[in-house]
């Protein structure tokens, strides 16, 4: 099981808002697929999957504020 985390987006950014999930639990994703749109202080950004697999768990809902470095979903690579 792999975890997708919020990447560091600049020196001042400590948290981001989840705008819209582009996937749901059970969806198959490939490396490079946009899985979620987030908003930082400066921009809206699409977070790409770093793994091929199935989304097994979404850990934060649309509208939630999430600290940089925190896991937002889990992907099963098997």
Regions found by a protein language model. Name each.
Residues 53-72:
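PDZ-domain C-terminal substructure recognizer with occasional recognition of PDZ-binding tails
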